[in-house]
Curated annotation (Swiss-Prot):
Protein name: Pentalenolactone synthase
Cysteines paired by S-S bonds: none
InterPro entries in the cross-refs: Cyt_P450, Cyt_P450_B, Cyt_P450_CS, Cyt_P450_sf, PentlenlactSyn
Gene encoding the protein: pntM
Metabolic or biological pathway, per its Swiss-Prot or TrEMBL entry: Antibiotic biosynthesis; pentalenolactone biosynthesis
Entry's EC annotation: 1.14.19.8
Named cofactor requirement(s): heme
NCBIfam families per the UniProt record, alphabetical: PentlenlactSyn
Function recorded in the entry: Catalyzes the final step in the biosynthesis of the sesquiterpenoid antibiotic pentalenolactone by mediating the oxidative rearrangement of pentalenolactone F to pentalenolactone.
Signal sequence bounds: none
Protein family per UniProt: Belongs to the cytochrome P450 family.
Amino acid sequence: MTDLPRLPFDNPDIMGIAPQMLALQKEGPIARVGTAGEDAWLVTRYDEVRTLLADRRLRLSNPNPQPSAKSAARAFMVALMAGDDHETEPARHAQMRSLLIPRFSTRRLRLMKTRIEHHVDELLDQLAASAPPVDLHRVLSFRLPTMVVCDLLGVPLADRERFGQWARGTFDQSDNEHSANTFQQVVDYMLELVARKRVEPGDDILSELIAEKDGALSDADIAHLGNAVLLFGYETTIVRIDLGTLLLLRNPVQRAQLAEDPGLAPAAVEEILRLGVGGKGSNALIPRYAHGDITVGETVIRTGDAVMLAIGAANYDDRAFPDGGLFDLTRVRPRSHLAFGHGARHCIGRTLARIELTAVFERLFRRLPDLRLAVPEESLRWQEHRITGGFDEIPVTF
């Protein structure tokens, strides 16, 4: 029986970092904790988390040959990475990035920005035309990233609603069998879509991948890359739109400044990305395994040890961000937050995510200056059973 602190920590607030996490951060950069699967090292301070994110000795796969306990989140990530072979993981990851990074070209992002702004205007029209209370999550937060990822992949309009529902179901870990089944539906659909694109290519990522290397990539390879685009760049943006709205509703003075000056939207987005943690912080922990001994302060992480990188806590660290828990649009040259990771695993879609969030928050409170929650904030439900967390609804009025 262990008496270690056990993740996830209770959090009385629906947003922000659990008090126990912050207490451990004050004590030191690293602590031993229990998890649902196995004991792990929890790293909470900014400098140490940033350093370890760039350390190639920390990987998703376990270097030990015996089966290891996996959290639901890690099991899903391993499945998406197509295996748990620690010897081939670096090469597979490098290949995936080399194929996907060119897909987010300046030309594509410029075109996507125009489309995204059009989508946001349409969705805000629908929101404004609805009789309150209306679910902002359903009308805006869920639909915009669905539209964007479907534009990227060339998903036909007729398929977009079910495609979005499958993607959501994949992240729901309350029923592992259901999650696995919906993930398989996504895989099957992606294979079907790739086959269609071979016959009728378009201006989308899948069509570009089909033409890559003179058509040498298999349908399975291309579908796998399409799944990565969908599942890594979709759900997290949904969550950030919800959290960003709530953060601004909590900060009326800065919300009013943003409504008056949409040029503040990029600064607002960076603070939303930095502080956007909800529930028990399940959406702000990165699980890894050590593939070599690593020293953190006076602690040695041994080969095979599980490590949890607390990017949420790191982004609240007062050592990196003075008054780190405060939402502040006027931060002067703030340090780079870790919401998109760092190093070799720095998020490929970070520029696109920023475009989406900026389009939302330079418009939302200008269009609906009286926007407010229609229910007490404490009644909102954070979905701990989802890999990325998130809310099931955000009822608002205006």
